[in-house]
Amino acid sequence: MTLQLRDVRKSFGATAIIRGVTLGIEKGERHAIIGPNGAGKSTLFNLVSGRFAPSGGSILLKGEEIAGLPPYRINRKGLARSFQVTNIFPRLSVYENIRCSVLWSLGHKYNFWKSADKLADAHERTERTLALIRMSARRNVSAGVLTYAEQRALEIGITIAAGADVILLDEPTAGMSHSETANAVELIREVTEGRTLVMVEHDMGVVFNLADRISVLVYGEIIATDVPERIRENPAVQAAYLGTADDA
């Protein structure tokens, strides 16, 4: 298992948000976590990525305990995430945004006397990432003037540019039009090839299109984990989240 959660719990005061989540995700798997608002999906992502420390349980990345580690250390171990709110450097160009992530991953530190433009290894990886997210032609555009869909694509590029092989995407298609969503799905499919993807997403079309398996989180507990076809037909999942044909 690339990512394992064992009886993971998180409480804020007397309020239990995550209630004993156990989940295993295989290397190269595309895994979606779905559930109603307030189910604890973003909290679970925050636990895995190190923004929150769990109240109990274990989180293993490639067999190594990461529960309670700070985000930068987890990132160094090969896990990166995006957020519901786009997290980019709006005043930097598309190229510079990607290069910042690459420089971090390569361990380059700020040096007043040395231009980052002369770092061949960083330049090559930046160019590869730009091509992968289809933004080579937009490389010199300030990130702040990109369309919303382009900014989301850039954020995915920043996420993978650091060399992470486990990617957490939080609502990657939220706020997109139908055509933008279709393009985003193909982009996510391409950039996660050979990587492990864990995704929180409300658009069921996206979920059933991309996911190898789906976990359903309700009130901080996983009530089902299975392949998309069985999740769609699961009576407990229909009652808790998806609804039935009669509800349409």
Roles of regions detected by a PLM:
Residues 1-248:
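Glycine-rich phosphate-binding loops of nucleotide-dependent enzymes
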